[in-house]
Amino acid sequence: MMNPMTSPSPQSLSARDLHEWLSSGSALQLVDVREHSELEIAPFPGQVEHLPLSESNLWLSDLPARLTTSKPIVVICHAGIRSRNFGCWLLAQGPDYDVWNLEGGIHAWSVEVDPSVPRY
């Protein structure tokens, strides 16, 4: 198992900064690791690669085809914890990935950027 104290960590990104990146047209890969039921409650706007952590056995072998090292990867979850853990794991798989964690997750997005996104 990974030791979080010695594992590479994703860079932190605030909801406002992510909004600026998206508004400017920056080429990003958005990865949402929440469960299907969470997406039904509060979907993240735009094109997002949905990789629920509980279903990693279904997508893990396809991961190199789904993600590229040529664009930053922003990982999203509910509060920023699962996304950070996935980001740490992803960096351990391929240090060439440029991984960012949405601090505070979809909750922060709802509070700081888009209050129309439901909170749960």
Residue spans of the language-model regions?
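Rhodanese-like catalytic fold shared by cysteine-dependent sulfurtransferases
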Residues: M2-Q29, H36-P72, I81-Y120
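Short, surface-exposed ligand- or partner-binding patches at beta-edge/loop junctions that are enriched
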Residues: I76
